[in-house]
A protein has these predicted regions:
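Bacterial N-terminal signal peptides
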Residues: 19-29
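Short, Lys/Arg-enriched N-terminal segments with co-localized hydrophobic residues
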Residues: 1-10
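Hydrophobic membrane-targeting alpha-helices
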Residues: 27-32, 118
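Active-site nucleophile-adjacent alpha helix/oxyanion-hole segment immediately C-terminal to the catalytic cysteine
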Residues: 86-282, 286-293, 297-309, 380, ...
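N-terminal regions that are enriched for targeting/export leaders
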Residues: 39-93
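Bacterial N-terminal signal peptides that target proteins for export
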Residues: 9-20
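Active-site signature of cysteine proteases
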Residues: 34-39, 218-423
Length: 423
């Protein structure tokens, strides 16, 4: 004998049957209307589309630091498919890499390298320019601002490429052999003693509240002359005696043609403003701010047009390896498909991305699925691996960790036009 079914139970069973029937109808309708080919649906497929299908391994690596060692978390590069040689790239004319050694002069090495490439692009004779000449006068101008601002100005070895350009406009340039900054038979740059003395002098000046600019700059120049030598007032060029500014004019470089770009949400896009990093010690507001896709596209576009590009990058990263000459973003940081304006800005505002090095981009390589960039680098890490003086940056590294670039205005004419249209 079957138990009697109540009216409520009967209605409940009827509801279940109707729900199942509706589910079947929706399932077959979706199958009939949906695409017939296999598509990137679901978490796993979406992960592949976003470059996260293969996870990078994180390992601890011992690195030399002074007389000792430190342990740092780095990416395991053994399985990385990467370029092995600059010959794999479409290369633009540039002079061989030069080491900056124990100095903070990367900003000047990168800018000088760009201008040397520009001379070659313009059909001028190959010319090695002096980095130390520009650095000398940068120290003078840093001291001048420190005095004028009553000590409220950054004192560091770093600077930005547009500051190097400003110093050349102000003081001119000379050739490398005309001013090496190397005394007493030295062959490697070392500014450690120079910078210590420079900083101590200015900090003592601040403590004494002595703001006599003329006296301070005379003392600063004496310190610079002691460590680097006195820069020449005139140089001999083919039998003619020229000042550094006259020599700059003779090169045919218009330094007003070089423009700098950033990509940050703290400024309205397609406007100019300040690049908010300590190395922009003079608070320049000459930076063009553009959306990230335009920013990244402008760098590759410039290279394709034959213009090299100076980059300001964060190199203190687990995906940056001198031993393998590469810069990439590992998946344990962020899958590359998720790199966007917000993730870039987030790392900048919390200090995870810092502007700690300037390099010179001199080529590119497009090979599915990646684009790689050939980087001429003056820092010591670029001399640890099999390829001396170069790095290979993958596009994701450029997108997330390159915070500023500078190039010739003709390389980015279309982008500059957007600024004219918005004003």
């Amino acid at each position: 004998m079957q138990p009697e079914i109540s009216k409520g139970e009967s209605m409940k069973r009827t509801g279940i049957i109707l729900s199942l029937a509706l589910s079947l109808v929706l399932f077959f309708a979706a199958a009939a209307c949906g695409p017939k080919e296999k598509t990137a649906e679901g978490p796993r497929a979406r992960g592949k589309a976003l470059g996260a299908s293969v996870k990078d391994e994180a390992v601890y690596v011992a690195e030399k630091r002074g007389e000792g060692e430190i342990s740092r978390l780095k990416m395991n590069f053994s399985a990385l498919d990467r370029p092995k040689s600059p010959e794999e790239f479409i290369r633009l004319p540039h002079l061989p890499p030069v080491r900056q050694y124990n100095t903070g002069m990367c900003w000047c090495f990168g800018t000088i390298s760009l201008l040397e490439s520009e001379l070659k692009r313009l059909g001028k004779p190959e010319t090695k320019l002096s980095e130390e000449f520009t650095v000398y006068w940068e120290y003078v101008e840093k001291a001048r601002r420190f005095i004028r601002e009553k000590g409220n100005s950054v004192l560091g070895e770093g600077s930005e490429p547009n500051s190097a350009i400003a110093r050349m406009k102000q003081y001119g340039v000379v050739r490398g052999p005309d001013y090496t900054g190397l005394l007493d038979g030295k062959t490697e740059h070392d500014h450690s003693a120079l910078f210590r003395e420079f900083r101590r002098f200015l900090e003592a000046y601040k403590a004494g509240q002595d703001w006599n600019e003329e006296k301070a700059l005379a003392a600063v120049r004496a310190i610079l002359n002691k460590h680097l030598g006195k820069p020449p007032d005139r140089i001999d060029i083919d039998g003619k005696s020229l000042t550094p500014k006259e020599y700059l004019d003779s090169l045919g470089l218009n330094l007003d043609d070089y423009v700098s770009f950033i990509s940050f949400k703290y400024l309205p896009f397609h406007t100019r403003g300040e690049y908010k990093v300590p190395d922009n010690w003079w608070h320049s507001t000459d930076y063009y701010n553009v959306p990230l896709d335009e920013y990244k596209g402008a760098i590759l576009g410039a290279l394709k047009k034959g213009f090299t590009v100076v980059l300001a990058a964060d190199i203190s990263e687990p995906g940056n390896s001198g031993e393998t000459n590469v810069g990439v973003i590992p998946t344990f940081d962020i899958p590359r498909g998720f790199i966007d304006q917000a993730s870039r800005e987030f790392r900048f505002t919390n200090g995870a991305s810092t502007d700690d090095h300037v390099v010179h981009c001199v080529g590119y390589k497009k090979s599915a699925p990646d684009t790689w960039f050939l980087i001429k680098d003056s820092w010591e890490t670029a001399y640890r691996g099999p390829v001396k003086g170069y790095f290979f940056y993958r596009a994701d590294y450029l997108k997330l960790k390159v915070l500023m670039f500078m190039t010739h205005k003709d390389a980015v004419a279309g982008l500059l036009a957007k600024f004219q249209a918005s004003n």
